[in-house]
From Swiss-Prot:
Protein name: UvrABC system protein A
Residues that coordinate or bind ATP: 33-40, 639-646
Organism: Staphylococcus epidermidis (strain ATCC 35984 / DSM 28319 / BCRC 17069 / CCUG 31568 / BM 3577 / RP62A)
Role noted for this protein: The UvrABC repair system catalyzes the recognition and processing of DNA lesions. UvrA is an ATPase and a DNA-binding protein. A damage recognition complex composed of 2 UvrA and 2 UvrB subunits scans DNA for abnormalities. When the presence of a lesion has been verified by UvrB, the UvrA molecules dissociate.
UniProt xrefs under NCBIfam families: PRK00349.1, uvra
Family matches, as PROSITE patterns: ABC_TRANSPORTER_1, ABC_TRANSPORTER_2
Subunit details: Forms a heterotetramer with UvrB during the search for lesions.
Gene3D superfamilies reported for this sequence: ABC transporter ATPase domain-like, ABC transporter ATPase like domain, ATP-grasp fold, A domain, P-loop containing nucleotide triphosphate hydrolases
One GO location term (cellular component): cytoplasm
Native organism taxonomy: Bacteria, Bacillati, Bacillota, Bacilli, Bacillales
Matching CDD domains: ABC_UvrA_I, ABC_UvrA_II
Amino acid sequence: MKGPSIVVKGARAHNLKGVDIELPKNKLIVMTGLSGSGKSSLAFDTIYAEGQRRYVESLSAYARQFLGQMDKPDVDTIEGLSPAISIDQKTTSKNPRSTVATVTEIYDYIRLLYARVGKPYCPYHGIEIESQTVQQMVDRILELEERTKIQLLAPVISHRKGSHEKLIEDIGKKGYVRLRVDDEIVDVNEVPQLDKNKNHTIEVVVDRLVVKDGIETRLADSIETALELAEGNLTVDVINGEELKFSENHACPICGFSIGELEPRMFSFNSPFGACPTCDGLGQKLKVDLDLVIPDKNKTLNEGAIEPWEPTSSDFYPTLLKRVCEVYKINMDKPYKKLTDRQKNILMNGSGEKEIEFTFTQRNGGTRKRKMVFEGVVPNIDRRYHESPSEYTREMMSKYMTELPCETCHGKRLSKEALSVYVGDYNIGEVVEYSIKNALYYFENLKLSDQDKSIADQILKEIISRLSFLNNVGLEYLTLDRSSGTLSGGEAQRIRLATQIGSRLTGVLYVLDEPSIGLHQRDNDRLINTLKEMRDLGNTLIVVEHDDDTMRAADYLVDVGPGAGNHGGEVVSSGTPNKVMKDKKSLTGQYLSGKKRIEVPEYRREITDRKIQIKGAKSNNLKNVNVDFPLSVLTVVTGVSGSGKSSLVNEILYKALAQKINKSKVKPGNFDEIKGIDQLDKIIDIDQSPIGRTPRSNPATYTGVFDDIRDVFAQTNEAKIRGYQKGRFSFNVKGGRCEACKGDGIIKIEMHFLPDVYVPCEVCDGKRYNRETLEVTYKGKNIADVLEMTVEEATHFFENIPKIKRKLQTLVDVGLGYITLGQQATTLSGGEAQRVKLASELHKRSTGRSIYILDEPTTGLHVDDISRLLKVLNRIVENGDTVVIIEHNLDVIKTADHIIDLGPEGGEGGGTIIATGTPEEIAQNKGSYTGQYLKPVLERDSVE
């Protein structure tokens, strides 16, 4: 290969079979192949892992102890490596304090902008706050009641870390006798040793006065002294009154509302200086929700209308409720909705000061008499949630609470002072509510004075450049205050991508995992141009991707396969996309060249009158839309990123159905009415969340096939002779499991400030079971051997047991024949977890009254895997059930019976129904972006 290259020899991570490959440097390299073929093992677990490990090895021993020891990948040699950065989908922060603006560091620059050129205004009078003179301060203090005792304090240290010994010594030398340290008055010579790792506030007591006539001169002199000491700031400690704060810098001349010096930390909702004191900077408060407390208002109190007070092992609350109703003459057999407002108010908010006496039965069967004020259901739930030491009680009470915007900051997260500062016409809380597209326009057209312009010029350049990168990767619809926990994997990855371009590093190896996820075809070109821009800076990009356009745009394409799991792990073909297309061995090449394809179905299923109707959908950006979801067909919901697909399907359709059918406590998005639910009795949301969060969960336990396998082992002669029941073969209970590792097969070693290390259990060698259990075999294999089989191997092994074979076959049908039965749930990718869930539904008997909801099921799937997935989904529909999919993949869209296309744009520009109908009807709609891209695909792939 001409030019510099990365040479990999003998890569054996996971299923790789000693792979040797040479990759060109400073190029856009795309790795593709079937799900489970080994492409991620080559890209992430070999090339990235070694690049990262070598970089960490070059650091000092001190720095390395914080980064942890990185294992050397199973590879002979890798030459030509650069420092590596991985941009995958797993590292989205779920921290509620993390937003799009903070993750991209745009917020840091916006805070700096507001601190440097912001103009504070009084929130009560709308007057710009300017500096106060000493005379104004004197006048304000003299307004206090006569004989009021005051202390004038000079705040020399305000909430800063350090022991501050030198400063305290200097204050003493200047002749000052007293200080107020962390709200305690102390003698300057008796200040206790301050913890240098904690924040402290130190104020010098400049003077002590009593407000009366004739103190003006002394007061003015003392104020001047304090202002000089504390750089223009003054605190007046009013004994038995509210403290006053003054500043030579900023205060309202009418009401004295004053803001200290503008600093970036004042605009941070993660700092006590900037956060709203009510919600601590979260913007939300957990409040009791009456719709969750009384889900069915047609019920009477005797029928259990107040759900959290349903009878338990103690009849405390039912007895209390009965007594309250007797005292206030509330009919317990009348539907709740027919009670008077006064009666509802007593039940929900309490009876005031009046005490109520009642006798209740305790858990031990004894009785007890109580006399108490009836606090009401709402305060009771709130109190038990906030004050109970029991985790269980708090969890139970949280079911009846909802996150609502904070009443003080109205969801803006910041203090009154921070929200009083404006740049142009907007405060910082209003600016971060903009979408990226609107924020970019705002900052590009911001009008500032010449002086402010010279101060803000560099800051604005940084803000605009970062916003431009986000705009260029198709994220213009996201708002800056959007919580990062609500972002999809693709969105989070593209945000990190934009952040990396902003850093403008060169000579770096970037490894990316399907950056096109969740991106509409329309925005793909922008993403590809971004990748090329990173390459042109002098970087090497290795992108694991299945997207047709990205593969064609690659400088170098690597097809890993030929199959998945044990049937994969080899490089089938590599070279330019054209070279791979001509390679007959390459499955990817055959699809790219058009020799293989997913056909458009010969006919579409008929749309009948059976449907779910949603009226007045208004969740997030949906604009009061009415939509029908036909039943017993395959419906695909399409639209550009941010057009409202998830709001319609996940927030409204799924949650509204789950609330009615599954009696779920989740609250759906805002809508007026939903009709047709009586035609369904089951709703299944098949998402990409893990099938379990512990190593104990695996595909065998999740699908239920492990129960049947344990039955088989319990029926063997050896098990019967020993008296072993089915439970003996469970690794979750005592008996048959290895007690050294409690059936985990691995032991966790806590490393304190290093990541926890997991090592195989030495007693059972990672087999999870004790020796006696492993002596029981079926067809020569013990239970641990079976868990180590791939699904495909197990299907052949149990082919004479129809019950087991049927369940395993569904895993094979969804393309998971390569995973092992005992593979830890935590090691499955999102796409694999989703297909395990799909398989576990497939083997259940169909009723024709079920609806399946899938959000981008093609994530992580090769086009050949998609072909298999479509067969499975069509099997579900053939049984009379309904499938609703959110999808951008044109191979899935073209096979739909019915399409609902949202748009036209993302964010505020979306939220309307652009078109509905068959793929052919959508393709004819000139206003639909989906239709524009669908039309050529339908013409190309239709059955001739």
